[in-house]
A protein has these predicted regions:
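Conserved amphipathic alpha-helical "coupling/scaffold" segments
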Residues: 1-151, 157, 161, 268-271, ...
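Amphipathic alpha-helical transducer elements in NTP-driven molecular machines
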Residues: 12, 44-47, 65-68, 96, ...
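Extended, charged coiled-coil "arm/hinge" scaffolds of SMC/Rad50-like chromosome-maintenance ATPases
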Residues: 136-152, 238-259
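Extended, Lys/Arg-enriched charged tracts that mediate electrostatic binding to polyanionic substrates
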Residues: 163-212
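Intracellular alpha-helical coupling/juxtamembrane segments of multi-pass membrane proteins
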Residues: 165, 169-172, 246, 250-285
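Long, charged, glycine-rich C-terminal linkers/tails
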Residues: 184-200, 289-312
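SMC-family hinge/dimerization module
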Residues: 199-230, 240, 302-325, 329
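ATPase nucleotide-binding head domains, primarily ABC-like/P-loop NTPase cores
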Residues: 294-298, 303-403
């Protein structure tokens, strides 16, 4: 499609508005890459998808696609047998949660067949393959959620080994605190504060520097002023060593849990990739529906004979309170249309409306016009508006030149 015409007709502003209705980065990327098609059947397919999404929203309410993650790199790592990190597994879980939500939304229940509105399930058929293709992989998602509580925390019961190590860590930590509290109470006058602190992963006491020889142990740090030394008492060095060994064991157990979850996800890389692509596509289609509802649009009919009939068309970039609807027909009784009138009379807006509607329609977007409006599919759209002033500036071609 002619890039100058896209710019002149301010197609990019419509695309930017469309992008705001997508919930995910992947959906937004599809919005930004949208360009008009010159294939009549493809245009009709796109229009049907937008229409079906609008119908679903009207009958069932909106569905949220928030939570779709780009897991492409993670899937490549699974394909070569690598283990995934906690954030990567959580991204897979987030994607599957959205897939489950979308699949449930796309399912036709007995009481949602449109009987109250007189509409039937057949109205949704163009979206059926997309919803049907989603694989929520519920067992995998449930296992990830059971094992991983957040990006910073793996559940104690993620594995028997991890559960055992953490119980041992709690026992050891209790013993350390008991020992330190005893030392703290008997040496309170030597301490800067009656608190237990951590330095380099070791439990320490804050000792006044002038009493450093009164508390036997290893110095791990000192305060900025040098008045406080953080000393690990000799009495707990063995316990601190035990705790450090347990922490190493804990990390190994966590890595084993992540490896196990990765192995469980590995056989489903194709399903996960398909989920990601289908959800991005659905997010994109429902963004079109959101834009259509915002502008109170309708689905235009299409032909390949060059016929245009716009009924009460409203330019989408103009203030809806002041925009004057236009009626345009062209291509049946006559093929050439000359628009005349005084300066600031709306000629440029009318021409831009016809051009922009054509671009929007061929992109699968509904147009802000009455039902029954008709557009044609063109291989190219050309526009020469002279100064190419913005519609939103409300300037005529003449007054813009004068400016």
């Amino acid at each position: 499609m002619n890039q100058k015409a896209l710019k002149t007709l301010e197609y990019d502003k419509i695309i930017n508005q469309l992008t705001e209705y997508a919930a995910s980065p992947l959906g937004k990327a599809l919005c930004q890459s949208l360009s008009p098609s010159s294939d009549l059947e493809e245009v009709r397919t796109w229009q049907a998808q937008t229409t079906d999404a609008v119908t679903r929203i009207r009958l069932k309410g909106s569905v949220s696609f928030s939570g779709i993650r780009d897991i492409g790199d993670s899937l490549k790592r699974l394909d070569i047998g690598s283990s995934l990190s906690i954030p990567e597994l959580l991204s897979i879980s987030s994607l599957l949660t959205v897939a489950a939500r979308a699949k449930a939304y796309g399912r036709h229940d007995a009481d949602e067949d449109g009987r109250e509105t007189g509409e039937s399930q057949d109205d949704f058929d163009s979206l059926e393959p997309l919803f049907a293709g989603l694989e929520p992989l519920t067992p995998l998602n449930s296992e990830i959620k059971r094992c991983i509580l957040s990006e910073d925390e793996v559940a104690d019961d993620a594995s028997p080994g991890l559960s055992h190590v953490r119980r041992s860590m709690k026992v050891t930590a209790d013993r350390i605190h008991t020992q330190l509290n005893s030392i703290l109470n008997s040496n309170r006058s030597y301490l800067q504060d009656a608190v237990i602190t951590m330095r380099d992963g070791r439990y320490c006491l804050p000792v006044k520097s002038e009493y450093k020889n009164q508390v036997s142990g290893m110095v791990h740090d000192q305060s900025a002023t040098g008045s406080t030394l953080f000393i690990e008492p000799m009495a707990i060095i063995r316990l601190n060593n035990e705790m450090r060994e347990l922490e190493i064991q804990e990390q190994k157990e966590i890595e084993a849990v992540l490896a196990s979850l990765s192995n469980q996800a590995a056989p489903y890389t194709e399903e996960l990739r398909m989920d990601m692509e289908l959800l991005a596509q659905l997010d994109f289609i429902f963004a079109k529906a959101g834009l259509a509802r915002h502008y109170k649009c309708s689905a235009p009919m299409f032909n390949d004979k060059g016929c245009i009939h716009i009924k009460d068309g409203r330019h989408p970039l103009l203030n809806p309170q002041f925009v004057v609807p236009i009626n345009v027909w062209l291509g049946r009784e006559f093929d050439l249309l000359i628009v005349t009138g005084p300066n600031t009379g709306g000629k440029t807006v009318s021409l831009k409306t016809v051009g922009l509607f054509t671009l929007m329609g061929q992109s699968g977007l509904h147009i802000p016009a009455w039902e029954g409006s008709e557009l044609a599919v063109f291989d190219q759209v050309f526009a020469d508006i002279g100064d190419e002033q913005s519609i939103e500036q409300s300037l005529s071609t003449f007054s813009a030149h004068m400016t």
